[in-house]
Amino acid sequence: MDPDGEEIYIIGSDENKNTVVSILNNYFENITIGYNRKTGKLDIISGTAQTEDETAFVNALNNAKIEVNLEIGNSQNTGHKKSNGEDLMIEGAGGFLGNTISYKSKEHVKENIAKVHTVQYLSIDAMVSFYNEKDWGKLINHEITESFFGGIISSDSNVPGRDENGVINSDIYKKAHAAATPQPYPIGASFFHH
């Protein structure tokens, strides 16, 4: 595995980063992950992906063109601002905060895309409140892969997931959410098919 190709970063307190890595290691059966304590960069310590969720995670990890940044906090306030200056809050435990595109030259065309930098937010406290413990790994993997697929969509379309005013592109979010690994149902949610 090319260590320079690993492009998932976790950002937050050491306690929250350790929590996320521990949850993912409990969730994944065939791979073990670790992280660089200085940079927050995730890596595979051992194993080979064998499930769809593991494969989706490894694909996100090994795509050097998409840099996934999972910001981990405790509240539903992301620490980001809306274009009107108000705090950007999430409704659940995770939130798509879009992405930006960096280019190899001043010409901002698809062929000159150097990297897409994504941002996803995870609230540990909301995750604990809204989801069963057995679903925490599934939720975290969903948030990572949603952010990754948002980056892929932006790379393919040359349209950032967040504009210069901080407005999140809802079309990119919807497509990324649909392409990501499945999200678990919150506690108490019931869905009936008629």
Where are the regions a protein language model picked out?
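Intrinsically disordered, compositionally biased low-complexity regions
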Residues: 1-98
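Acidic active-site catalytic centers that drive phospho-/nucleotidyl reactions
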Residues: 2, 142-143
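Generic structural signal for residues positioned in beta-strands
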Residues: 9, 119-121, 179
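Generic alpha-helical structural element
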Residues: 9-13, 129, 169
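Extracytoplasmic/secreted envelope proteins and their assembly/folding machinery
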Residues: 21, 138-141, 177
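Intrinsically disordered, low-complexity regions
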Residues: 30, 41, 58, 85-87, ...
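Active-site scaffold of zinc-dependent metalloenzymes
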Residues: 69-137, 144-151
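Active-site or metal-binding loop neighborhoods of secreted/extracellular toxin and effector enzymes
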Residues: 134, 149-194
